[in-house]
Amino acid sequence: MPRIETRNMDLTTEYFVGTCTHVNESEEADACGKRRVSWFRNMYEKGLRVKVALLGEKPIGFLYAMPIEVCPWGPLGKDLLAVPCLFVLNEQKGKGAGSALIAEAEKEARRQGKKGIATMGYYHDFWFMPAGFFEKCGFSAMGKSREVTSEGEKEYLSKEAILWKVFDSSAEPPEFLKPNYQFEPISGKIVVDLFFNVFCGTSNGEAQRVREVVAEFGDSVVLNEYSADDPAILRRYQLPRGIFINGKEIGWGYEAPRDGIRKAISQALYKD
């Protein structure tokens, strides 16, 4: 019986990782995957590592690890390794892949001389980054949890917490992102403010949809893009993902559908 192994992402697994497991699903997923893989490669020198779990030669899960200073998802901190996302195929859960990936992340953190590992965990029944799993792996919730308020995400996620595992007692606690968005109107225009990052497949994919839909409206709509992949942008606005139309946030949790984006812009135009 094949056993679970872990490796760094390579040419044989980058398609699985880049498409967030949506292999051979659509041209859109493939295009998104290419953008993400390019970003992964560019970030390698800054400490990004993608760990892949395999059963035999079949990839079944992955984990992203990077210095917290360059992580586009939060939390904010220093001298820690951030794990913004860990995923294991549903049919392969409970077999040790997730724990094996966490063990690799710990090795990577020590290899890079970090004082610990930090992640965002959620207390809910949804699959994304369950806090209970990280606690079973030895992570501790730092301070109090807080309610998820982002439009769309709050439909799936309830309370979020910063969880960390410390190797060095001098490690400084990371901090929650605190969104700092202020709408700036432009006379006679509908303004779309897009906060996104290339790292997250969901954010990456919906950002491209927003660009395409906004282009349909020509000069009537102004698009402002804010990429959380730039640490300075993330620290200024502290929003890794969000779509605002004339200051009002829209969201679905999953990738914003084109029809939904189009309808929201049309309603704003009609209102004005």
Name what the model sees in each region:
Residues M1-L55, Y181, C200-G201, E206-E212:
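Short amphipathic alpha-helix that is part of the acyltransferase structural core
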Residues F40-V52, G61, A82, R235-Q238:
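A short helix-loop-beta-strand connector motif used in the catalytic cores of GNAT acetyltransferases and
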Residues G74-N90:
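Conserved acetyl-CoA binding element of GNAT-fold acetyltransferases
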Residues V88, G94-A109:
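Conserved acetyl-CoA-binding loop-helix of GNAT-fold acetyltransferases
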Residues A109-Y123:
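Conserved GNAT acetyl-CoA-binding A-motif
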Residues M120-G121, E135-K159, I250:
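Conserved catalytic-core motifs of GNAT/GCN5-like acyltransferases
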Residues E147-Y181:
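C-terminal "cap" of GNAT-fold acetyltransferases
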Residues G247-D272:
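Non-catalytic, surface beta->alpha helical segment in thiol-disulfide oxidoreductase systems
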